Amino acid sequence: DGVVAINTLKAMAIDVESGRPILGNRFGGLSGPAIKPVAVRCVFDLADALEIPVIGVGGISRWQDAAEMIMAGAAGVQVGTALRNPEGYGIFRSIAEGLSTYLERKEMTLEELRGIAGRFS
């Protein structure tokens, strides 16, 4: 068992000249870096409330983003929108190597990092 949180948020944009929705189907979704603070908060709340793993999703494009999700309590992370970056699938290696270097520098394990933000509340 586990839970994945979050993904795209409901969004809409309106042309101020015509008053018409810009997107063809009227509604769309907001994803990527713009939703990361919302995603981190959701992961923090869910990890605190649940006894099952939480996978953090939303705005992860750098190792620092993954670290932040893990600090909020995520057992793992998912990358989506960032795959469109020029780095492509190389982002996985970049995130893993950056996180590994960070943990070595901090002399911490991934488990010690997980949920650390909750220890300050």
Residue spans of the language-model regions?
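Glycine/Thr-rich beta-alpha phosphate-binding loop at enzyme active sites
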Residues: 1-52
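Glycine-rich phosphate-binding active-site loops on the catalytic face of alpha/beta enzymes
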Residues: 2-12, 59-60, 65-94
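Thr-Gly-centered strand-to-loop micro-motif
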Residues: 30-33, 56-57, 79-80
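Glycine-rich beta-to-alpha transition loops that act as phosphate-gripper elements at the mouths
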Residues: 36, 52-64
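General structural feature for long, well-ordered alpha-helical segments within catalytic domains
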Residues: 38-42, 65, 91-99, 109
